[in-house]
Amino acid sequence: MNDLLRPALYGSTHNIIPSIKKFKYLNKNHEFVGPICESTDKFLNLKKFQTLNEKDLVIICDVGAYGMVLSSNYNLRTKPAEILVNKSLVKIISKRQKLNNII
């Protein structure tokens, strides 16, 4: 909700893909949620997704320019990095915010 407000605000959906592909999938419901304990901090429900372990990363696709503009430091959470991916080009647009930048 603080990182990506669009699903809570507009009901938008974004593709979610694993950062590292594994080939073991679970045929059960997966709910992707954010770190805030709010009922609207949900991104997507999927019926089939690969198995994930603690600290595995996923990519929320096609967030666009409004993703960071609508983000906040709600609950003293730092803002994520912005990464542009275009075919084989991967570029860090802004680095992950550090706590000492907001205190």
Please give the residue ranges for each predicted region:
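Charged (often Lys/Glu-rich) extended helix/loop segments that serve as interaction or gating elements
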Residues: 1-103
